[in-house]
């Protein structure tokens, strides 16, 4: 039997403009059924606009939005099999918890006893089975957040859109909810599209992350791929902490930076092509100055609980961030070592679109 690989949601060449301001530029996105996806990017990059376009609250200026293979650009929001959990929860303050969850079902004229069963089940899913009769003003922020999720899940959507649903919670509750949401998604097996500007949250929760900036998706991939192989300076900087150092690709598997040559794992660039080299702070080991592949001078350090964050400078005045379990002496030189596969070489100003364009040109030749 053929496996259905059609994406549940597909966006092709979607743009959105408000007057002169283009807030989405040629968005292409495929979401498979049953996976946890995250849109990650800074404030104002267009994450919410993508969610609203999928939900049917905003019309795309151009391009197509598909649900299960059908174009849904003109389908009203209430007829889409998609529900949204909003950042501010948007609960009805004059209704109790159960009434809030029941609201959408009543609107769809679902029979009363079915409503009761489904509401109870949805409340149990988010561990609020006993709080149905409480007023919204009588529950905590974290519980309100769960009501908002229950209210969306009770509609049995195929896709759940979550717009920064954890941003109002304190750090501890936020971590707990990350686990719970991930667990819920896996148990229900529906597609989640989650929006955040918190890279740690995105890395912890997602099957796949789309990193956005200024209305564009710069890179999509698994958390490990995006962390280990950032496509450009922006992604490297946005996902985790990085040392990004200017360099030159001498030939395949050989790169130069800070005036020295290093073996690396990258290939396929022009000889002597100008590049940027990414080295993660946790991939650098400190050794005696005369044994290092590079020598840097320690400027300052902070104790971060399970490691020391050390700031140092090389002779070209590049700043180096190093994570070490041992402290270093400020003002003193230290040696840094790293493995060839810890060096990640990036082309300058690389984006997936630019890469794809190059590939197409290559295929046409
Ligand atoms: N109705 C509107 N009219 C004009 N501009 C809008 C409108 N809605 C959004 N924008 C603009 O579109 C851009 C993208 O907004 P969007 O809300 O999608 O960003 P975001 O990535 O979700 O940001 P945040 O993380 O702050 O919520 C912003 O510059 C915003 O000001």
Curated annotation (Swiss-Prot):
It catalyses: ATP + H2O + polyamine-[polyamine-binding protein]Side 1 = ADP + phosphate + polyamineSide 2 + [polyamine-binding protein]Side 1. Keywords: ATP-binding, Cell membrane, Membrane, Nucleotide-binding, Translocase, Transport. Its EC number is 7.6.2.11. GO terms for molecular function: ABC-type putrescine transporter activity; ATP binding; ATP hydrolysis activity. It comes from the Bacteria. ATP binds at residues 41-48. Disulfide bonds: none annotated. Residues 9-239 form the ABC transporter domain. It is a peripheral membrane protein. It is an enzyme of class 7 (translocase). It is found in: Cell membrane. InterPro entries: AAA+_ATPase, ABC_SmlMolc_Importer, ABC_transporter-like_ATP-bd, ABC_transporter-like_CS, Mo/tungstate-bd_C_term_dom, P-loop_NTPase, PotA-like, PotA_ATP-bd. GO terms for cellular component: ATP-binding cassette (ABC) transporter complex. Pfam families: ABC_tran (PF00005), TOBE_2 (PF08402). PANTHER family: SPERMIDINE/PUTRESCINE IMPORT ATP-BINDING PROTEIN POTA, SPERMIDINE_PUTRESCINE IMPORT ATP-BINDING PROTEIN POTA. Belongs to the ABC transporter superfamily. Spermidine/putrescine importer (TC 3.A.1.11.1) family. Part of the ABC transporter complex PotABCD involved in spermidine/putrescine import. Responsible for energy coupling to the transport system. The complex is composed of two ATP-binding proteins (PotA), two transmembrane proteins (PotB and PotC) and a solute-binding protein (PotD). This is Spermidine/putrescine import ATP-binding protein PotA. It comes from Lactiplantibacillus plantarum (strain ATCC BAA-793 / NCIMB 8826 / WCFS1). The lineage of its organism: Bacteria, Bacillati, Bacillota, Bacilli, Lactobacillales. The gene is potA.
């Amino acid at each position: 039997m053929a496996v259905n690989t059609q994406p549940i949601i597909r966006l092709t060449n979607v743009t959105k403009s408000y007057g002169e301001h283009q807030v989405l530029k040629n968005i292409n996105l495929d979401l498979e059924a049953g996976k946890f996806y995250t849109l990650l990017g800074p404030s104002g990059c267009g994450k919410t606009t993508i969610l609203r376009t999928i939900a049917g609250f905003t019309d795309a200026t151009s391009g197509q939005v598909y649900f299960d293979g059908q174009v849904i650009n003109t389908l009203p929001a209430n007829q889409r099999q998609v529900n949204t959990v909003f950042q501010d929860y948007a609960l009805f303050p004059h209704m109790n918890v159960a009434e809030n969850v029941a609201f959408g079902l009543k609107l769809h004229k679902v029979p009363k006893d079915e409503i009761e069963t489904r509401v109870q089940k949805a409340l149990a899913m988010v561990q609020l089975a006993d709080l149905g009769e409480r007023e919204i003003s009588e529950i905590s922020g974290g519980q309100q957040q769960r009501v908002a999720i229950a209210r969306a899940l009770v509609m049995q959507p195929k896709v759940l859109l979550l717009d920064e649903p954890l941003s109002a919670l304190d750090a501890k509750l936020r971590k707990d909810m990350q686990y719970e949401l991930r667990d819920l998604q896996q148990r229900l097996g529906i597609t989640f599209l989650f929006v955040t500007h918190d890279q740690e949250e995105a890395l912890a929760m997602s099957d796949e992350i789309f990193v956005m900036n200024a209305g564009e998706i710069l890179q999509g991939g698994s958390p490990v791929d995006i962390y280990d192989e950032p496509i450009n300076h922006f992604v490297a900087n946005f996902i985790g902490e990085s040392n990004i150092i200017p360099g030159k690709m001498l030939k395949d598997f050989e790169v130069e930076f800070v005036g020295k040559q290093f073996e690396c794992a990258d290939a396929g660039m022009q000889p002597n092509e100008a590049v940027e080299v990414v080295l993660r702070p946790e991939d650098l080991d400190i050794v005696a100055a005369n044994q290092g592949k590079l020598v840097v001078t320690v400027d300052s350090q902070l104790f971060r609980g399970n490691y020391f964050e050390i700031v140092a400078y090389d002779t070209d005045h590049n700043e180096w961030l190093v994570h070490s379990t041992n402290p270093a002496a400020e003002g003193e030189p230290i040696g840094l070592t790293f493995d060839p596969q810890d060096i990640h070489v990036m082309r300058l100003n690389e984006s997936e679109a630019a890469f794809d364009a190059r590939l197409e040109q290559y295929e046409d030749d």
